[in-house]
Amino acid sequence: MNYFILILPILPYLYGPAVCSEDETRLVKTLFTGYNKVVRPVSHFKDPVVVTVGLQLIQLISVDEVNQIVTSNVRLKQQWKDVHLQWNPDDYGGIRKIRIPSTDLWKPDLVLYNNADGDFAIVHETKVLLEHTGMITWTPPAIFKSYCEIVVLHFPFDLQNCSMKLGTWTYDGNLVIINPDSDRPDLSNFMESGEWVMKDYRSWKHWVYYACCPDTPYLDITYHFLLLRLPLYFIVNVIIPCMLFSFLTGLVFYLPTDSGEKMTLSISVLLSLTVFLLVIVELIPSTSSAVPLIGKYMLFTMIFVIASIIITVIVINTHHRSPSTHIMPAWVRKIFIDTIPNMMFFSTMKRPSQERQEKRLFPADFDISDISGKPMPASVTYHSPITKNPDVRSAIEGVKYIADTMKSDEESNNAAEEWKFVAMVLDHILLCVFMAVCIIGTLGVFAGRLIELSML
C-alpha cells in the first residue's frame, strides 16, 4: 500500500504519453481512412479552394548579371482549408493540432513561373500543421532561381527591379483562388546582403485571361523587389584607381622635356592601366545590352592616356625643333610667345625675343678701336693707309667673319630657344587642360546618376 502511494504521483507521466499517442494515432487513422489526396478538399465541385499565400524572404544569395538570374532563399507560406480533415478535439483527448507529412494530403500546385534555373515547384516536402477546423498551414523552405532582367546601364550605381511570379500550374481561378496574405512580402527574418540593399518591395495579384479560354481567369501573385547595389567595392577597387591613372597622365606635362622621361612615364601609365583592366574585367558584367557607367569611365581613362601619349610626342617634337628644319610661323610666335605668356602665371619669365636683345655679341656702337685698344682717328676709313696694311686688313676681315659666324649661331640658338619656349607653354596649357578634363570627365560620367539616386 505504501508503494502504491509513492508511485501514484508519477503514473500520469508514465501512461500520459502513451494515451496521447494512442489518441493521435486513432485521429490520424480516422482522418485518412478513405481520404483521396488527388481530389480538391471542397464540399461541392463548383466551390473553389481559397489559398492564402505569403512569401518570406530570408536571404538574397546572388545576382548573376550575365545570365540574369537572382538566387534567393525563401519560405513560401500557404494556408487553405480541407473540409475532409476536421474533428472534435474532445473526442481525441483534446488534440487541436497535428503535424503530418505534406505528401499525404492535397496541396495547391504552386510554382515559380519565372523560374530560370532549377526546380519550378517546391522540392523539400516538409510537414504541414493541421488544425481541428481543417485549416492547413504549410511553410516549406525553397531556393528560388528567378529570371530578372538586369539593366547594367548604370552599373555599379544601378537599381534593379526583380520579381517572383507565383501561381498554380493546373488549376484556374474558378477552382483555386490564391490571395496574398499582405501587400508586402515578409522581411522580418531577412539577412542583409553585403552587395545589395532592399529599397522597396510589393506584392500584386493578377487575373490573366488567355485567348484559348477568355472566360476563365488564371491567377498569379507577383512579388516585386527593388534592389539597390552598394557601390563601395567598385569605387575602391575600380573607380579610384582609374582616377589615379588619369591624374598621373596629367603629371606627364609637368615633367620637364629636357629630363627625357616624358615618354617613359606615359608608356608606363598605359601599360599599368592595361594590366589593371585585364585584372578587373571579370568584375564588370559581360553583356552587350548596354555599356555600363564603369565601362564608359574605363574607356574614357584609356582614351585619356592614349591622347596624352600622342600630345606628348608632339610636344617633344616641338621642343627639339631647329631653324634648319622648321621656321617658326609668325602666328605661332604671336600666340605662344607674345600673347599666352602674358595671360598665364609664368608671364614674368624672360622670353627669347627679350633675351635676344640682351645677348648681342657686339654692341650697336662697336668700332675698330675695340680691336686695337686705341682710339682710331676720325679720318681713318676702310680705304685709309692704316687699313691698307695687309696684316691689319686680314685681322679686320677675320674679326668680321667671326662676328658673322657667331651672329648666325646666336640667331640659330635664339630660334631653338623659341621652339623650346613654345613647348614649355604647351606643357603648361596641357597640364591645366588635362587636369580639368580629368575632373570634368569623372563628374560627367557619374554625377548625373548619383544625383538621381540621392533623390530616391
From Swiss-Prot:
Residues listed as glycosylation sites in the UniProt record: N161
Reactions catalysed, semicolon-separated, are: K(+)(in) = K(+)(out); Na(+)(in) = Na(+)(out)
- Residues in the Cytoplasmic compartment per record: 317-428
| Claim: Magnesium is one of the keywords in the record | no
Q: Which GO terms describe its biological process?
A: acetylcholine receptor signaling pathway; chondrocyte intercalation involved in growth plate cartilage morphogenesis; membrane depolarization; membrane repolarization; monoatomic ion transmembrane transport; motor neuron axon guidance; neuromuscular synaptic transmission; receptor clustering
Say what the protein does. Answer: Upon acetylcholine binding, the AChR responds by an extensive change in conformation that affects all subunits and leads to opening of an ion-conducting channel across the plasma membrane.
Q: What protein does this entry describe?
A: Acetylcholine receptor subunit alpha
Lineage summary: Eukaryota, Metazoa, Chordata, Craniata, Vertebrata
